[in-house]
Amino acid sequence: AEGALPVEFVLVVSSHAGVRGLVIAAEADIPSQTLLPKDFGSLDAYGRAVFDACRAASAELVVMAGFIKYVPIPPDFENRVVNIHPALIPAFCGHGYYGHRVHQAVLDYGAKVSGCTVHFVDNEYDHGPIILQRVVPVQDDDTADALAARVFEAECIAFPEALALIAQGSVSVEGRRVRVRATEPRP
């Protein structure tokens, strides 16, 4: 189908029961698991369980869409885990910067632009190599809700674009720098 990502979703893992992502997975016949952090003795044990599930499903790439819980990234998944952040990293990011907190911080600081960042996940919050960013202007009369809505629109373009680039083999990582080989002209 037009606009479809050139990927196969093999598993959905959630850190909360009853979330919309699990419903979407069920409707699409994608296997899912709910792994509650409280059921594990430590963050490391929780991370092992998450990535053991990914390995068992033969996942080549892990997408942390809406997964706010910190999870240690094992060496065999280095540069194979991606996330999106609702600001232009390295600004307005790190521990505690998620959801509307990010947008309110952008407004409180008086920033003129915001946006979103798709990045590889490493073992620090919002720190991994940046794959791509989209800029969103901050309007003088913005509220956190209004800015969040515009940033979300940008996220809905950026995340699939980044995933498609990775799936096509167009992305390589050299230290902190992500190189994107030209495929088709990007909008």
Positions of PLM-derived features:
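One-carbon transfer enzymes
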Residues: A1-P187
